Amino acid sequence: MSESSNTNLEQAKQEGKYIRTIRSFVKREGRLTKGQAAAIEKCWPIMGLEHKNGMLDLSEVFGNNNDVVLEIGFGMGKSLVEMAKNAPHLNFIGIEVHRPGVGACLMDADEAGITNLRIFEHDAVEVLADCIADESLTTLQLFFPDPWHKKRHHKRRIVQGEFVEKLRSQLKMGGVFHMATDWENYAEHMLEVMQAAPGFKNQSTTNDYVPRPDLRPLTKFEQRGHRLGHGVWDLMFERTK
């Protein structure tokens, strides 16, 4: 196991699987609404992906060879569904551990009639380790992850050196890791980790943050934050090696 500084991933390989002792999330089980439960029952056989099935053949999953965008922790899925609807020429994979969010996302996707979205209900780090082939993703998105704002919890932040090194191999050359956070301290942490990570180039002309690109929908949460004077920081790093 690597002994690099603060990491939320203490991993060892055993039989080809990653073993983790520190997780970047706390699983809070909320109640499903009737609509969410119905959407899971109806849509999961078509849109659901299972971690236990192992490595994906993405062209088989989607029935085409379109570029693939993967989002970690999509919450209730509104932005992800909007992106998939606005970009039918791309394929999207969303990963979320909270079942109500999965149900809400499937409900919206079904209502929107989109066919270019697939969903995992599983730990994203394990999905990346076991299900996503190297050089298979055009974009990897991480929007508003848990900031773990207390210093003693910083090791739980998902953006750490080992995690970034793993996802770099899964991005195609020229692929982009796009992050967004409304916690300035976490933005600074992300920037520090990414600047130290080999094989990435910052797409910011000022070598720090980028304006929110049009492709990332503005959420209601974000709009409220803007009205209250809260900042949001986007970071986009391109794989170069």
UniProtKB/Swiss-Prot annotation:
Q: Where does S-adenosyl-L-methionine bind?
A: 71, 96, 123, 146
Binding residues for substrate: 150, 182, 219-222
The active-site annotation reads 146
For this protein, the Enzyme Commission number is 2.1.1.33
Write out the catalysed reaction: guanosine(46) in tRNA + S-adenosyl-L-methionine = N(7)-methylguanosine(46) in tRNA + S-adenosyl-L-homocysteine
- The organism named in the record is Pseudoalteromonas translucida (strain TAC 125)
GO CC terms of this entry:
tRNA methyltransferase complex
| Full protein name | tRNA (guanine-N(7)-)-methyltransferase
Coiled-coil segments: none
Family membership noted in the UniProt record? Belongs to the class I-like SAM-binding methyltransferase superfamily. TrmB family.
What pathway does the UniProt record associate with this protein? tRNA modification; N(7)-methylguanine-tRNA biosynthesis
The molecular function terms of the Gene Ontology recorded here are: tRNA (guanine(46)-N7)-methyltransferase activity
Top EC class for this record: transferase
- Keyword terms: Methyltransferase, S-adenosyl-L-methionine, Transferase, tRNA processing
What InterPro entries does the database record attribute to this sequence? Answer: SAM-dependent_MTases_sf (IPR029063), tRNA_(Gua-N-7)_MeTrfase_Trmb (IPR003358), tRNA_methyltr_TrmB_bact (IPR055361)
HAMAP family to which the protein is assigned, alphabetical: tRNA_methyltr_TrmB
Q: What does this protein do?
A: Catalyzes the formation of N(7)-methylguanine at position 46 (m7G46) in tRNA.
